[in-house]
Amino acid sequence: MTDKKTETEKTETEKTDRAGTKDITVVHLVRHGEVHNPQGVLYGRRPGYHLSDLGRKMADRVAEHLEKRDITHVVASPLERAQETAAPVATSHGLDVAVDERLIEAANVFEGKTFGVGDGALRKPDNWKHLTNPFKPSWGEPYIEQVVRMMGALDAARDAARGHEAVCVSHQLPIWIVRSFVERRRLWHDPRRRQCTLASLTSFTYQGDKIVSVGYTEPAVDLVPPHLRAGAKPVKGKSKAFGA
């Protein structure tokens, strides 16, 4: 009698496990690869900035990393660097790259200007008025607005790949902000401390509609220039913001 009950319990557990597995969805937020930007411009949402040769290698590395994953949906920011990073992933899974405007880079008043350490836009007094409130921030798109649109993009990707996995290619700041929100950290932060290297994956696991875990991987970290890696110290004349 006891043995029979145990077998029944096992069967019920297996059914529950199978049902639960079907309702597990993973959404990978991928930061694009390195961009060709020899002038060191903070390009932001400006069109015309494409992946460098190294950036294309990073994109290929991401595709290799995800080749055996159950990817059924690939979507990207409308900016060229994001589309070009998404393309190898989509190709390896026989998919098209969809576009979601909500994955776009954060707006920034310094777009089009150089923004290095010890030089560039911050040395000009006319720009100091934009630096009055780091909590909003005063120089760009409010953090809370980034959270709203990025959560919307994540939820849409989850629904499109329900029970499978989705890839969303976006940009450093919005990826970091939405991760900070999900992990219940404050949204204002030191940009040098963002854990969001070029061609990295920030992966959100959903059970049903609820995020139950967040993971982070760097499949192309060996290709990333040292000054652009997470936690690296800034170098004069170079900015981590260039690859945002």
Task: Say what each PLM segment does.
Residues I24-H32:
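Short, hydrophobic/glycine-enriched beta-strand segments
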Residues V27, H164-Q172:
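Generic beta-sheet signal
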Residues E34-T85, V89, W139-M151:
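Loop-to-helix element that buttresses phosphate recognition and phosphoryl-transfer chemistry
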Residues V35, P174-I175:
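Short active-site segment of divalent metal-dependent hydrolases/proteases
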Residues K68-D70, A157-H164:
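Glycine-rich phosphate-binding loop signature in dinucleotide/nucleotide-binding domains
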Residues T91-G152, G215-Y216, P225-R229, P234:
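Phosphate-handling substructures
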